[in-house]
A protein has these predicted regions:
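Divalent-metal (often Zn2+) His-rich catalytic cores of metallo-beta-lactamase-fold enzymes
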Residues: 220, 240-297, 301
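Active-site HxH/HxHxD metal-binding segment of metal-dependent hydrolases
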Residues: 80-180, 189, 283-284
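Conserved beta-strand hairpin/beta-sheet module of binuclear metal-dependent hydrolase folds
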Residues: 27-81, 211-223
Length: 354
């Protein structure tokens, strides 16, 4: 989940978006019968999470259902080109809006579909996530659209951006939020035709209830936002548990990793870079706090030691370097300090003031 606005904002503006057409997703066949769908971001309003379809001779499992009904409908249209089998399972990895707000597409098309998530994820979806999103509903996105309307009035070239934002807001306004119908605690193994599909939860990581999916026969791991290509998003994370979870993923016999955003990975270099950064931040944060430094001071002190792993993620792109410093290092270090101050609750932490 990443946005320059609130992560799950909705708008109540009555705007016509009939003429706006979303492009089809990029479809990547990761392995036989395993397809990744990468949908277009909603401009500055937010990214859309990856969706993955696992095909079998008895049906389909969809991992993560995108951030809007329109996005998931485009993904389903592509799935229908690949198979006439029904979608039997939708697994939502965590509560961030861009991974589950499109679930209604599947429950409408397949009334018997099972919607699966970790028990903590269902708890978050049912209440705290809604409250977390409220500022965007009430102020941030309406203000964003108003700004775009003013810009488009002055410069017609800005009209496509406005059209896209209006479409996004209408989608968020009208999305029917579908809660999981099946939950689990630690592991859940599903048999879907010829495939064995393992759902696993190790610890609180990015959220209290992160699910990753493992296909042991195919040696594929699907991570949700536990890993993002190129840079993970550490807001409200659980540092020690997140590292434990990545270590568990690393221990699997996984030849391919499909992240929560971005293209699939056919080696573990990006995974290891994230693990290295997290280990260093955990160690540096503890040491700095003992010496009386605050989280911002600790972050600045450790940044030079993170450069090699940063380059694995950013390839020294200036924009990505800045995202690395904010989304991963800054936010993770603040959560390290929160964790050092005592046990973390499941409550969603606010964005650190900068």
């Amino acid at each position: 989940m990443r946005s320059l606005l609130a992560p799950a904002a909705i708008c109540a503006l009555a705007l016509s978006t009939a003429d706006y057409v979303r492009p089809a997703p990029q479809v990547i066949e990761v392995a036989k019968g395993i397809h990744l769908f990468i949908t277009k971001p909603y401009g500055e309003a937010g990214l859309d999470g990856n969706a993955v379809a696992i095909l079998s001779n008895d049906g389909v499992l969809v991992f993560d259902s995108n951030g809007t009904p329109a996005a998931s409908a485009l993904v389903l249209a592509e799935i229908r080109k690949l198979t006439d089998k029904p979608v039997r399972y939708v697994v939502n990895s965590h509560w961030h809006w861009d991974h589950w707000y499109g679930t209604e597409t599947y429950t409408k098309a397949f009334p018997g579909v099972k919607v699966v998530a970790h028990e903590k994820t269902r708890e978050m979806m049912a209440g705290p996530a809604i409250e977390f999103n409220r500022p965007g509903i009430e102020s941030q996105l309406p203000g964003y659209v108003a700004m775009l309307e003013k810009r488009a009035a002055e410069n017609p070239a800005a009209q496509p951006v406005l059209d896209e934002a209006r479409f996004f807001l209408e989608q968020k306004k009208n999305a029917k939020l579908v809660l999981p119908t099946q939950t689990y605690t630690d592991t859940l193994t599903l048999k879907l035709g010829e495939r064995e599909i393992q759902l696993r939860h190790v610890d609180r990581a990015v959220t209290p209830g992160d699910t990753f999916l493992y296909l042991p026969a195919e040696k594929i791991v699907i991570t949700g936002d536990l890993l993002v290509n190129p840079i993970a998003f550490a807001l409200s994370s659980y540092p020690t548990g997140w590292l434990r979870t990545l270590e568990a993923i690393d221990a699997l016999d996984g030849a391919i990793i499909i992240p929560g955003h971005g293209e699939p990975l056919r080696d573990k270099a990006l995974l290891h870079a994230h693990m290295n950064v997290m280990r260093e931040l955990l160690k540096a944060g503890k040491d700095a706090k003992q010496r009386g430094l605050d989280a911002d001071q600790a972050k600045e002190e450790v940044l030079p030691r993170l450069r090699a792993d940063m380059l694995v993620m950013t390839k020294d792109d200036p924009k990505l370097n800045e995202q690395f410093r904010i989304y991963l290092v800054d936010w993770f270090m603040h959560r390290v300090y929160d964790e050092l101050n005592g046990p973390l609750s499941d409550a969603i932490a606010p964005i650190p003031r900068r």
